[in-house]
Amino acid sequence: MSTAVTAMPDILDPMYWLGANGVFGSAVLPGILIIVFIETGLLFPLLPGESLLFTGGLLSASPAPPVTIGVLAPCVALVAVLGDQTAYFIGRRIGPALFKKEDSRFFKKHYVTESHAFFEKYGKWTIILARFVPIARTFVPVIAGVSYMRYPVFLGFDIVGGVAWGAGVTLAGYFLGSVPFVHMNFQLIILAIVFVSLLPALVSAARVYRARRNAPQSDPDPLVLPE
């Protein structure tokens, strides 16, 4: 594997999970579905998203695919939707307590507050848009649950988002899998996908850091929780 890709944290490298010597090895379909469900349903945002689905699509386009695209694409879309339903009802269950959870290695309070701001800005369309934004796609369904967004509305928009993201990115990898340039530059393409997908989160983190540095030292305003 190239230096560029090995420079990525292992957990964000799709081949760490799906490679011949990866965590899941040849079990590509179960591996992808497990990771998608953990990221979307169990509030663990630090996993590969678009790069994993794109890689799965590429593998399904190989001469001896570990899984066919006709099975992979709908299964990913279905599990993505099921994961969001889980996250929505977690939000309904725990409510505003999520905003008070202390930071840990894999959880930062600003993940929730920024997802809440994203939700407030775009409303119900957030359910679709957040699918393509790492971290936001993990926490926006929870925020929808905390906000008691009407479930039929959430479900409808989530199905659209789940199909667009889960099946769409996977199909993109499948159809581009026959392009020689993609095969020759696979590692760099995956690195680019990871970078582009993380860019919004990096920009947001930079803004938060700059705002904290420039803010006067005073007691922070209390967070207004969704109704």
From Swiss-Prot:
Chain ranges passing through the membrane: 27-47, 63-83, 126-146, 153-173, 186-206
Listed InterPro entries: DedA-like (IPR032818), VTT_dom (IPR032816)
Keyword annotations of the record: Cell membrane, Membrane, Transmembrane, Transmembrane helix
Domain of life: Bacteria
Entry annotated with the keyword Cell membrane: yes
Compartments where located: Cell membrane
Pfam families reported in the protein's UniProt record: VTT_dom (PF09335)
This protein's GO CC annotations: plasma membrane
Membrane topology note: Multi-pass membrane protein
Family stated for the protein in its record: Belongs to the DedA family.
Protein name per the record: Uncharacterized membrane protein MT0380
Organism, as annotated: Mycobacterium tuberculosis (strain CDC 1551 / Oshkosh)
